[in-house]
């Protein structure tokens, strides 16, 4: 396959890094499909032997459309005529792989440029660029919808693959379609609270580049649950699973926290595939107190009763999960696991960010208040995950998140008991290539 020329186009698929206008001579980038044997073989299996009605409407193949061939039948045979469609799909995969390789090769350059900006400015620029790239069709050249599919069923939900985006990147739920194009099997938006809130004063987001880590003290800045629901309703192209991560407003006292969670649960229920209750952010004063066994039991009881009512009202069950901190001791984990099993919790997300700074001691930002995420939290987070897996005994689903930056890390989470995994910080540092690698490997 000869290289093509892709000139003067705005390339904008850079989480945390933004976009730039540039001229690219892709003929200098080796991109035949043979360069991607694992991808090619996986796509042969997934798209040539499986019907894609599960994840979206079946339609004709096009270079910028979903890889979902419409089978036609011959009057002379009871079998579908697939040869032409197979060839079209395979040729399109070469195009997609070509553009993906171009962007992967440019990624370090984009990252270096965006890392010159304030972290939060780069964050917003990146999300707006992603949305623009999705609307203009640029993303469809790099990743066809459902291209990295290895379906798995968890909590009664069908996930296109095991790799999700953790809460915190898309706080408003307005970038879901674009993120889905990058290969995520599920996207968790938020944290979202009942009322809009601005969050903590800036600066509140810090990169610890040598450690591939981030410290944030954002403070649940979000547009409020009504806006979040409206944004999700507008996301019509993503065929994966959408989770709502919900929290309480900063000015809501803990004794009234259940009211905030109930407001969010009711509002999100019609459009959410699952709802995650954030009890573990270190950036809302007193929030982690809700992780106490008694407080969690009371909250879970109220939420489960509401879940049952909403399930009857809407004719579907939306799984309920709790997101926990990595800074839990073994006895605390055992107590919480007992509460979760007794209360019928559907799943646990392990874990949130850590307050521990030992792994980044000496860095200029180590003393900044907030939660630490990225590579330094891997060991601590995986320990908590494994402990929950032991105490839950398979009676609740587990999503492993925290420090995943490679296929080996993700497999370690699965080995520790995770049914699914999520990434965030490593996505900022490594880009969409990591999503594809994880989705193909798990």
Predicted regions and their residues:
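Residue-level detector of structural "landmarks"
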Residues: 32-38, 75
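Glycine/Thr-rich beta-alpha phosphate-binding loop at enzyme active sites
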Residues: 131-133, 138-145, 282-295, 338-394, ...
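Catalytic cores of alpha/beta
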Residues: 174-179, 330-340, 405-421
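Glycine-rich phosphate-binding active-site loops on the catalytic face of alpha/beta enzymes
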Residues: 188-194, 349-354, 410-437
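A gly/proline- and charged-residue-enriched helix-loop-helix capping module
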Residues: 190-240
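C-terminal helical cap(s) of enzyme catalytic domains, especially alpha/beta-barrels
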Residues: 199-212, 359-370, 427-442
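Alpha-helix-loop-beta-strand connector modules within alpha/beta enzyme cores
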Residues: 213, 223-226, 230-239, 293-314, ...
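Active-site glycine- and acidic-residue-rich loops that bind
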Residues: 249-261, 289-295, 321-341
């Amino acid at each position: 396959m000869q290289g093509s020329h892709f000139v003067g186009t705005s390339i904008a698929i850079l989480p945390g890094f933004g976009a730039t206008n540039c001229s690219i001579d892709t003929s200098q980038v080796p991109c035949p499909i043979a360069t991607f044997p694992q991808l090619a073989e996986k796509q042969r299996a997934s798209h040539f032997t499986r019907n894609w009605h599960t994840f979206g409407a079946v339609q004709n193949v096009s270079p910028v459309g979903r890889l979902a061939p419409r089978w036609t039948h011959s009057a002379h045979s009871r079998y579908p005529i697939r040869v032409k469609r197979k060839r079209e799909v395979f040729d399109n995969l070469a195009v997609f792989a070509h553009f993906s390789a171009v962007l992967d090769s440019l990624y370090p350059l984009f990252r270096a440029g965006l890392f010159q900006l304030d972290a939060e400015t780069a964050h917003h620029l990146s999300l707006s660029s992603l949305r623009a790239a999705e609307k203009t069709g640029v993303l469809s050249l790099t990743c066809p919808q459902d291209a990295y599919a290895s379906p798995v069923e968890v909590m009664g939900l069908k996930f296109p693959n095991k790799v999700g985006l953790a809460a915190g990147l898309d706080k408003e739920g307005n970038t879901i379609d674009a993120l889905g194009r990058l290969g995520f099997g599920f996207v968790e938006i938020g944290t979202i609270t009942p009322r809009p809130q601005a969050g903590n004063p800036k600066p509140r987001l810090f990169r610890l580049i040598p450690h591939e880590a981030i410290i944030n003290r954002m403070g649940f800045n979000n547009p409020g649950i009504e806006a979040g629901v409206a944004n999700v309703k507008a996301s019509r192209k993503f065929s994966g699973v959408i989770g709502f991560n919900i929290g309480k407003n900063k000015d809501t006292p803990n004794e009234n926290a259940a009211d905030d969670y109930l407001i969010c649960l009711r509002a999100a229920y019609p459009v959410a595939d699952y709802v995650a209750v954030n009890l573990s952010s270190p950036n809302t004063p007193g929030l982690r107190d809700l992780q106490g066994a008694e407080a969690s039991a009371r909250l879970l009881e109220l939420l489960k009763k509401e879940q049952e009512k909403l399930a009857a009202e809407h004719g579907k069950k939306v799984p309920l999960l709790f997101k926990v901190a990595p800074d839990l001791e073994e006895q605390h984990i055992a107590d919480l696991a007992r509460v979760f099993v007794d209360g019928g919790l559907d799943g646990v997300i392990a874990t949130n960010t850590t307050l521990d700074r030992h792994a980044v001691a000496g860095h200029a930002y180590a003393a900044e208040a907030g939660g630490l995420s990225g590579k330094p939290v891997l060991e601590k987070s995986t320990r908590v995950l494994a402990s929950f897996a032991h105490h839950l005994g398979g009676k609740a689903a587990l999503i492993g998140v925290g420090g995943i930056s490679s296929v080996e890390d993700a497999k370690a989470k699965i080995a520790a008991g995770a049914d699914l995994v999520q990434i965030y910080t490593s996505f900022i540092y490594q880009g969409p290539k990591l999503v594809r690698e994880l989705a193909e490997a798990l």
